[in-house]
Amino acid sequence: MPCRREEEEEAGEEAEGEEEEDDSFLLLQQSVTLGSSGEVDRLVAQIGETLQLDAAQDSPASPCAPPGVPLRAPGPLAAAVPADKARPPAVPLLLPPASAETVGPAPSGALRCALGDRGRVRGRAAPYCVAEVAAGPSALPGPCRRGWLRDAVTSRRLQQRRWTQAGARAGDDDPHRLLQQLVLSGNLIKEAVRRLQRAVAAVAATGPASAPGPGGGRSGPDRIALQPSGSLL
């Protein structure tokens, strides 16, 4: 029957196509594994040319390429070059034209690092590098010199010394701080005795002398006004 013959012919054609594909695969594998380096390079160049042509047909215009310049496929010279030495084509970059203000050189003395001057001590108000920029659109901030770190460390040490001296002066007037220092040093009893002796001497020097009695003795013991413990310490 004709239908059965057509089916047999189609099945035979499919079998022949599969055999051809298998043969081509085997030939390709043999050429890659057993062929010389020239054949491999030629095959790689042909594959790359085919891929580039397909990519050029899919994307007619490249966004990076300037208008009016068509993409050219690699010629026979490019195919003859080995694949390991071939380089991708350079793509031109479109850059905006620079303005005259940005291209022009900055005026001399426009930038000066405030912390770059060695030997100059900075205060607490400006511990970081501050670049003094002159008026003008072309003046740009620049890097500071290497001495700014050394100046910052010196200023910090001076500030710590000032704070330590100020704290010591304030500690003499603070009774709680003085009491803490005496307790830690172990001189609390000595300081209390010294202050009591000073108070007794002050009272004896300023107080009126008591009148002597008929027996030539004193009418009573001397009255000594002692200060409270809070005022002593």
Swiss-Prot record:
Positions of region (Involved in GSK-3 binding): 174-196
Biological-process GO terms, alphabetical: canonical Wnt signaling pathway; regulation of protein export from nucleus
UniProt name for this protein: GSK-3-binding protein FRAT2
Disulfide bonds: none
Superkingdom of origin: Eukaryota
Protein role: Positively regulates the Wnt signaling pathway by stabilizing beta-catenin through the association with GSK-3.
Subunit structure as annotated in this protein's UniProt entry: Binds GSK-3 and prevents GSK-3-dependent phosphorylation.
InterPro entries for this protein: GSK3-bd (IPR008014)
Statement: the UniProt record of this protein carries the keyword tRNA processing: no
